């Protein structure tokens, strides 16, 4: 696999040589991060491509474009080198701004169309809802933000995942995301390093939701109570009620409750595998933790791949219904606790 570099003006494009293959990594975090990091030395054979590597130049990996956002040039004696961080081109959405705002009952597609009406960079989007689970929710002054910020709001509001193919963006409900594989990860067997946090403090099996109230104080729909089938195993454990006036139908509230309820032990962890492993974004794998007798699916929500070496990837696995931001905060706290 070749890495290509082009200048900001896209006048020149060269194959990148002279980079340290052990330094080259691809980091992806669901809905949050996608970047390349690498180290490259300047030599007589790569002077042209080395000079192409600059702030805002492009790096191409497997057909995807990444933009150099951080570049550190250094010299030790006669050795000149650069440390490069390039983020996926979809992050350039943040350079456009939607000044206008919309309100009322809106679908995810309407919100996305409103966002990209302000796009000046050639982004396109597709919303795929094969099981028709998405419904309108009430928006109030949606807009007045950069496009990336507004997309993040839509992902959270409508419980979506975004998949980027350069500037072609696909949005799907979180329930439809990820391939269920037959791969198994067994604690202390398939890993050299494992750091799993298994938490039943947040385990709940029932939740009630309240939606919009009209000007006369009447509910648009009666409160919705969802009881998980897992209650037959764990008993009825009541989660704090959810109240959100953006919801005007019981069916849309029911979907939200099912996605909010943490009805199985929350599992989040980092692992380093013993062997090279081709992991896909959002893949589900079977997690086996024999000390607690646990056997259930967890999802790949982040990875760090070392593409040009045989070093296995580092994976973050989770079945936690928290957002990735919450997950990363949780992991950071766990790491700090371990250091003390």
PLM-predicted stretches and their roles:
Residues 1-31, 186-200:
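Solvent-exposed edge beta-strands and adjacent loop segments
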Residues 109-113, 148-151, 206-207, 254, ...:
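Extracytoplasmic/secreted envelope proteins and their assembly/folding machinery
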Residues 89-92, 104-110, 321-340:
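Cys-His-centered catalytic/binding microenvironment captured across papain-like cysteine peptidases
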Residues 2-4, 179-299, 304-310, 322-325, ...:
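Acidic, small/polar-enriched beta strand-loop surface segments
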């Amino acid at each position: 696999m070749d890495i290509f570099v082009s200048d900001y003006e896209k006048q020149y494009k060269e194959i990148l040589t002279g980079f340290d293959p052990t330094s080259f990594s691809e980091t992806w975090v669901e809905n949050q991060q996608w970047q390349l990091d690498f180290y490259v030395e300047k030599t007589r054979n790569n002077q042209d491509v080395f000079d192409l590597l600059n702030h805002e130049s492009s790096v191409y990996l497997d057909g995807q474009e990444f933009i150099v956002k951080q570049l550190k040039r250094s010299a030790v004696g006669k050795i000149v080198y650069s440390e490069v961080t390039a983020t996926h081109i979809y992050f350039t959405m943040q350079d456009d701004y939607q000044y206008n705002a919309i309100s009322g009952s809106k679908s995810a597609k309407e919100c996305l169309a409103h966002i990209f009406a302000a796009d000046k960079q050639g982004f396109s989007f597709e919303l795929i809802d094969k099981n028709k689970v998405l419904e309108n929710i009430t928006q109030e002054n949606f807009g007045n933000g950069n496009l990336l910020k507004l997309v993040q709001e839509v992902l959270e509001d409508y419980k979506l995942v975004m998949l980027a193919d350069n500037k072609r963006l696909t949005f799907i409900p979180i329930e439809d995301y990820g391939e269920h594989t037959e791969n198994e990860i067994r604690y202390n067997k398939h890993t050299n390093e494992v750091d799993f946090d298994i938490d039943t403090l947040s385990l709940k099996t029932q939740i009630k939701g309240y939606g919009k109230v009209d000007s006369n104080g009447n509910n648009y729909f009666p409160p919705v109570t969802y009881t998980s089938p897992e209650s037959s195993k764990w008993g009825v454990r009541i989660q704090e009620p959810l109240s959100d006036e953006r919801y005007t139908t019981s069916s849309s509230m029911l979907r939200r409750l099912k996605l909010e309820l943490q009805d199985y032990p929350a599992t989040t962890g980092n692992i380093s595998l013993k062997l090279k492993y081709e992991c896909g974004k959002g893949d589900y794998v079977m997690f086996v933790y024999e000390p607690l007798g646990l056997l259930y699916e967890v999802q790949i929500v982040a990875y760090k791949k070392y593409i040009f070496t045989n070093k296995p990837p580092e994976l973050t696995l989770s079945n936690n219904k928290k957002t990735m931001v919450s997950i990363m905060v949780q992991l950071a706290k766990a790491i700090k606790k371990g250091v003390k």
